[in-house]
Amino acid sequence: MAKAKFERTKPHVNIGTIGHVDHGKTTLTAAITKVLADKYPDLNQSFAFDQIDKAPEEKARGITINISHVEYQTEKRHYAHVDAPGHADYIKNMITGAAQMDGAILVVAATDGPMPQTREHVLLARQVGVPYILVALNKADMVDDEEILELVEMEVRELLAAQEFDEEAPVVRVSGLKALEGDPKWVKSVEDLMDAVDESIPDPVRETDKPFLMPIEDVFTITGRGTVVTGRVERGIINVNEEVEITGIRPETTKTTVTGIEMFRKLLDQGQAGDNVGLLIRGIKREDVERGQVVIKPGTTTPHTEFEGQAYILSKDEGGRHTPFFNNYRPQFYFRTTDVTGVVTLPEGTEMVMPGDNTEMSVKLIQPVAMEEGLRFAIREGGRTVGAGRVTKIIK
């Protein structure tokens, strides 16, 4: 069979299944791929349950995560779907952002209703900025009582509302297992679910449409031309002769103009998200810029020293610390391209954090870092990763 080529014509959306470990996330994921492969055979292939369940290990910021990626298409969109089978894997993925989500399908078994893990996943989705959640009420074939289904649906809506998600989000009754077996009623339920995903999850803003930002990895001088900063464009577009600011690490922000853009030794008029480029900058001495700063569209992001974050601390088996840490812990926080030392304050009532825990923390950095909510960081001790997190709130 000819491999379907990646069509750039359709919007691309990253989604994932979240929810309690026994509520059928992986079965439902397999069912989605099968139902769509049957409905649009020229666009899709199906993935068997065990292909998804035997999730390959991935390293994200030094942390090993078991996670499965499948892709499929509806008429409207191209989807990349992640499924983290284990609870710990899910938490690690959310915090390290091995796979970012533009929206999530919260899977809740109609037989059980929301469980503590369900709540934890929704809370985490809120903290790490998942934009939208809709609900698959799974195993609905096993509940005959309409009142029970309505009760579970109400509970789930309350749970979403409590974390400021859309209380009116679609709640679709499905059976992943029956759909996989080809039962027409439940195949239709999965088709309905995907229609709801198409309709309710908003189109993501493309990286190229966001304001320009490039973390500086290296700085050097080209004799007779000036200073060049290199890095990978994180978002947005940069054109020759545009004004930029260089910010972070140092107390002051510098304004300059990009007079040349180079990629693979060729001169370009434009660099965009994903490109590794060198930017020639006017009137800046080599010693005025350094790795760890960012080049930005003027005024679009600011440097900060104090923030709140959500972090996952590696267990001993994952190569993390062997002992807990306490208030006033002073590791390095690795943002984008550089380490900055910070002092950690734990939440009230938390005496210490054990390896393998996930925790909230307040951090005070010794140098400012250009950041916004959602920015990821690694926690390091002398170059060794001991944790990963993301900024949930900027304080100062």
From Swiss-Prot:
<dbReference type="InterPro" id="IPR041709">
    <property type="entry name" value="EF-Tu_GTP-bd"/>
</dbReference>
<comment type="subunit">
    <text>Monomer.</text>
</comment>
<keyword id="KW-0479">Metal-binding</keyword>
<dbReference type="InterPro" id="IPR009001">
    <property type="entry name" value="Transl_elong_EF1A/Init_IF2_C"/>
</dbReference>
<feature type="region of interest" description="G2">
    <location>
        <begin position="62"/>
        <end position="66"/>
    </location>
</feature>
<keyword id="KW-0547">Nucleotide-binding</keyword>
<dbReference type="InterPro" id="IPR004161">
    <property type="entry name" value="EFTu-like_2"/>
</dbReference>
<dbReference type="Pfam" id="PF03144">
    <property type="entry name" value="GTP_EFTU_D2"/>
</dbReference>
<feature type="binding site">
    <location>
        <begin position="83"/>
        <end position="87"/>
    </location>
    <ligand>
        <name>GTP</name>
    </ligand>
</feature>
<keyword id="KW-0378">Hydrolase</keyword>
<dbReference type="GO" id="GO:0005829">
    <property type="term" value="C:cytosol"/>
</dbReference>
<dbReference type="InterPro" id="IPR005225">
    <property type="entry name" value="Small_GTP-bd"/>
</dbReference>
<comment type="function">
    <text>GTP hydrolase that promotes the GTP-dependent binding of aminoacyl-tRNA to the A-site of ribosomes during protein biosynthesis.</text>
</comment>
<dbReference type="Pfam" id="PF03143">
    <property type="entry name" value="GTP_EFTU_D3"/>
</dbReference>
<dbReference type="InterPro" id="IPR033720">
    <property type="entry name" value="EFTU_2"/>
</dbReference>
<dbReference type="InterPro" id="IPR004160">
    <property type="entry name" value="Transl_elong_EFTu/EF1A_C"/>
</dbReference>
<feature type="region of interest" description="G3">
    <location>
        <begin position="83"/>
        <end position="86"/>
    </location>
</feature>
<feature type="binding site">
    <location>
        <begin position="19"/>
        <end position="26"/>
    </location>
    <ligand>
        <name>GTP</name>
    </ligand>
</feature>
<comment type="similarity">
    <text>Belongs to the TRAFAC class translation factor GTPase superfamily. Classic translation factor GTPase family. EF-Tu/EF-1A subfamily.</text>
</comment>
<feature type="binding site">
    <location>
        <begin position="138"/>
        <end position="141"/>
    </location>
    <ligand>
        <name>GTP</name>
    </ligand>
</feature>
<protein>
    <recommendedName>
        <fullName>Elongation factor Tu</fullName>
        <ecNumber>3.6.5.3</ecNumber>
    </recommendedName>
</protein>
<feature type="region of interest" description="G4">
    <location>
        <begin position="138"/>
        <end position="141"/>
    </location>
</feature>
<keyword id="KW-0251">Elongation factor</keyword>
<dbReference type="InterPro" id="IPR000795">
    <property type="entry name" value="T_Tr_GTP-bd_dom"/>
</dbReference>
<dbReference type="InterPro" id="IPR050055">
    <property type="entry name" value="EF-Tu_GTPase"/>
</dbReference>
<dbReference type="InterPro" id="IPR009000">
    <property type="entry name" value="Transl_B-barrel_sf"/>
</dbReference>
<keyword id="KW-0342">GTP-binding</keyword>
<dbReference type="Pfam" id="PF00009">
    <property type="entry name" value="GTP_EFTU"/>
</dbReference>
<feature type="binding site">
    <location>
        <position position="26"/>
    </location>
    <ligand>
        <name>Mg(2+)</name>
    </ligand>
</feature>
<keyword id="KW-0963">Cytoplasm</keyword>
<feature type="region of interest" description="G1">
    <location>
        <begin position="19"/>
        <end position="26"/>
    </location>
</feature>
<dbReference type="GO" id="GO:0005525">
    <property type="term" value="F:GTP binding"/>
</dbReference>
<dbReference type="InterPro" id="IPR031157">
    <property type="entry name" value="G_TR_CS"/>
</dbReference>
<keyword id="KW-0460">Magnesium</keyword>
<dbReference type="GO" id="GO:0003924">
    <property type="term" value="F:GTPase activity"/>
</dbReference>
<dbReference type="InterPro" id="IPR027417">
    <property type="entry name" value="P-loop_NTPase"/>
</dbReference>
<keyword id="KW-0648">Protein biosynthesis</keyword>
<feature type="region of interest" description="G5">
    <location>
        <begin position="175"/>
        <end position="177"/>
    </location>
</feature>
<dbReference type="GO" id="GO:0003746">
    <property type="term" value="F:translation elongation factor activity"/>
</dbReference>
<dbReference type="InterPro" id="IPR004541">
    <property type="entry name" value="Transl_elong_EFTu/EF1A_bac/org"/>
</dbReference>
<feature type="domain" description="tr-type G">
    <location>
        <begin position="10"/>
        <end position="205"/>
    </location>
</feature>
